[in-house]
Amino acid sequence: MSQTFLAFSRPSIGDEEIAAVTRVLRSGWITTGPECQKLEEEFAARVGARHAVALSSATGAMHVALLALGVGPGDEVITPSQTWVSTANMICLLGATPVFVDVDRDTLMTSAALIEHAITPRTKAIVPVHYAGAAFDLDPLYALADRHGITVIEDAAHAAGTAYQGRPVGQQGTAIFSFHAIKNMTCAEGAMLVTDNARLADRVRQLKFHGLGVDAYDRLTLGRKPQAEVMEPGFKYNLADINASIARVQLQRLDAINAQRQALASHYLERLANSPVLPLALPRYAQQHAWHLFILRIDPERCGLDRDAFMKALQARNIGTGIHFIATHLHSYYRKRFPDVRLPDTEWNSSRLCSIPLFPDMSLDDVERVVGAIESTLESSH
């Protein structure tokens, strides 16, 4: 009898999350309100940030953060191509130009040294990515950005619970976390922007709710002020209390969730140590990995088949996989707009990346099942 399908990711939702949603539904206030306020306070306390603003998605958060910084036509924003397309999309939609930099072949993260070569007088911001749960090497980057007077916005979508040099990601500067369904903590869709810049926080809060001079939920009047006026055109990126209530429970569970992810990842690393598949390398500097993803590189010369054939073979064995990600500059729009971009290490990885199952409700037996499927696939390819 064939085994049931094992997805590459699945949210961990329990009775506490269900009870939290039920409580909000019965409260009579289901959109942005007290749950969202408490989530902001609790998340800021968790990472040691001065300000936290909840939003409906990390894409929306990146949009208003870049806009709040004044990014627009004629500006450049440096970011790796090896990431999800939303950052580059937002840069382009603001009329600015994404400047793509290469990554380390084995960690998939760029570096201050690579970024420095891309800085020009038009550089307005730098968006580094904490990849797959590992921390970006922040100290050299912030030193570089300070020398040039350039703002950094950390893409921390993969980094809930990640730490760098003993400090939680999000403690310094500005960072954006995602609460999408496959992330370490989720509320289906949602995000948190944290920052030590009070003016930026106020502008983001205004832009994410129609440009009104007050938030969707006024903390002083416990409602919406009737005299609220539009201070500038804005958007509708506020997070509902239904979602915030789930995120609050998930935040309380985050340490346990990440500990289970760590245990599963450690077992994968041990079992795949002598396999021709290539897991991502761990950064050499001090950091605490949140293990959002477990990524392999399927090199045809080592494995005897390419990534797509490998994924198809695992699917036939009822094992789900994912790709994180096809490099941004290789997507159709960006190929046409930036035909001369060449990023050798990014491109080498883009055709080889494969994410295998990793989520907190998995067991070590599930890991063994995945490893067994990988081994039988490789044996068949030879």
Swiss-Prot record:
Give the modified residues of type N6-(pyridoxal phosphate)lysine.
Answer: 183
The UniProt catalytic activity note for this protein reads:
UDP-4-amino-4-deoxy-beta-L-arabinose + 2-oxoglutarate = UDP-beta-L-threo-pentopyranos-4-ulose + L-glutamate
* Cofactor requirements of the protein: pyridoxal 5'-phosphate
This entry's Gene Ontology molecular function terms read: pyridoxal phosphate binding; UDP-4-amino-4-deoxy-L-arabinose aminotransferase
Q: In which pathway does it act?
A: Nucleotide-sugar biosynthesis; UDP-4-deoxy-4-formamido-beta-L-arabinose biosynthesis; UDP-4-deoxy-4-formamido-beta-L-arabinose from UDP-alpha-D-glucuronate: step 2/3; Bacterial outer membrane biogenesis; lipopolysaccharide biosynthesis
Gene Ontology CC: one annotated term: membrane
Q: Which GO terms describe its biological process?
A: lipid A biosynthetic process; lipopolysaccharide biosynthetic process; response to antibiotic
Which Gene3D superfamilies did the record assign? Aspartate Aminotransferase, domain 1 (3.90.1150.10), Type I PLP-dependent aspartate aminotransferase-like (Major domain) (3.40.640.10)
EC number per UniProt = 2.6.1.87
Highest taxon listed in the record's lineage: Bacteria
Q: Name one Pfam family in it.
A: DegT_DnrJ_EryC1
For this UniProt record, give its keywords in alphabetical order, as a comma-separated list.
Aminotransferase, Antibiotic resistance, Lipid A biosynthesis, Lipid biosynthesis, Lipid metabolism, Lipopolysaccharide biosynthesis, Pyridoxal phosphate, Transferase
The record's similarity note reads:
Belongs to the DegT/DnrJ/EryC1 family. ArnB subfamily.
Quote the subunit structure annotation. Answer: Homodimer.
Q: What does this protein do?
A: Catalyzes the conversion of UDP-4-keto-arabinose (UDP-Ara4O) to UDP-4-amino-4-deoxy-L-arabinose (UDP-L-Ara4N). The modified arabinose is attached to lipid A and is required for resistance to polymyxin and cationic antimicrobial peptides.
Q: What is this protein called?
A: UDP-4-amino-4-deoxy-L-arabinose--oxoglutarate aminotransferase
